[in-house]
Amino acid sequence: MIKNIGYFIVLAFLFSCKAVIKVQEFQNKEVPEAPNYLNEENWAVLPSTYSLDLKEFETKSIDSLKADVFYVYPTLNTAKEDLRWNAPIADLEQQYKVLNKVVLFQASAFITSGKLYVPYYRQAHLRSYSMLEKGGKKALLLAYSDVKKAFEVYLKKYNNGRPIIIASHSQGSTHTKFLLRDFFDD
């Protein structure tokens, strides 16, 4: 009996051990380069750049759609070992996730509602929400600054007075809440 308790204690210690990853506080010198939304490559999706996979969801001609959909995607930067507060938009792994997971399985739901606009942005790491005082707040504000700039470019370059649907999920909703406040609240 005592031997079994000893094994249980050893197993409990083994299973409770985990690697500790020390996250540095947010520092401005480590901020990825800001995107220029006048350049099409800084958008995951524009109506002129729909992928063949995305076009499969179309049931109406894109020119017949009466509204635009500005979609801000959810948190994808979740790996514990990734110590960056914000992912650069040129990160190919992040781009792959945006295009092949989020756009195809979430944003595509809006493809028959309006022309789809999805900007890449310097997304904050998931830990930002639990470490607001250590740098999370700064990381989220940086991400929002990209979403806001993308929306400003969208309004000036693409909107042409069309109705707008603002759609989002997870971290994207954190940012669109402020977007609605900054652009639509009186």
Predicted regions and their residues:
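Active-site catalytic motif of lipid deacylating hydrolases and related acyltransferases
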Residues: 73-163
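Bacterial Sec-dependent N-terminal signal peptides
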Residues: 1-22
